[in-house]
Amino acid sequence: EGQAALASGNTGAAIDAYESALTVEPGSVSVLLALADATRQEGMQGKALHYYRVALANDPRNVAAITGEGLALAEKGATEKAGRNLVRLQALCGKDCAADSPLAEALARKPAPKMVTATSVTAKTLISEN
């Protein structure tokens, strides 16, 4: 159900279907990865990272989870952490690993722009006479 919704471009319905499947099969790595991929496609990298990390807790050598986590990190602008995932992938399956290709390409691209937060901006104090 989730795959069909995702194939038709309805990521919201896919996420709902995968979340329902997760209640039936809690801890299922394949469902977690599908849910993580769908949430990442929807632009919810933080939520995707959570699902990738739960999948990695269940299967620490899962190449798809390491790749997905790295892609989500790169999309958030955390290229240093994403680079660690690339090194980990290359250690697991060698320099010519097909799984590291999307992550290597994402890291080669320009990093995502940093989000502006209230703490990263300082207001200029302007004092004027009345």
Predicted regions and their residues:
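Residue-level recognition of tetratricopeptide repeat
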Residues: 28, 62, 96-97
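Structural marker of alpha-solenoid helical repeat scaffolds
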Residues: 24, 58-59, 91-95
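Canonical tetratricopeptide repeat
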Residues: 34-35, 68, 102-106
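Canonical positions in the second alpha-helix
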Residues: 20-21, 54-55, 88-89
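Position-specific recognition of the canonical hydrophobic site in helix A of tetratricopeptide repeat
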Residues: 6-7, 36, 40, 57, ...
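Terminal, low-structured helical/coil segments at or just beyond the last alpha-helical repeat
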Residues: 84-130
